[in-house]
Regions:
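A conserved regulatory-domain signal marking ACT and ACT-like small-molecule sensing domains
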Residues: 1-80
């Protein structure tokens, strides 16, 4: 099963690398990525697939929300 995360964050040096690194370390594969940026804020959309059934996208969203630059994380189902 795939999930989609939409992450709103403050555009800062290294922010995208930190978020993607956390996603991969927590056992998810990035299947798609899109980003939009305006001045000092940005939005990152990640299509994810867990590497095993034990991985929870809800826990991942909480962990991403703890990063300094992250303002909001929304979970949505992967479109069919």
């Amino acid at each position: 099963m795939r999930d989609r995360l939409v992450i709103d964050f403050a555009a800062a040096e290294g922010a995208v690398v930190r978020m993607i690194g956390l996603v991969e370390r927590r056992g998810f594969r990035v299947c798609g990525i899109a980003m939009a940026e305006e001045e000092e804020k940005a939005s990152l959309t990640l299509d994810l697939q867990p590497l095993d059934a034990k991985r929870s996208v809800d826990v991942l969203a909480l962990q991403l929300g703890r990063l300094h630059e992250v303002r909001n994380v929304a979970i949505s189902g992967f479109p069919s």
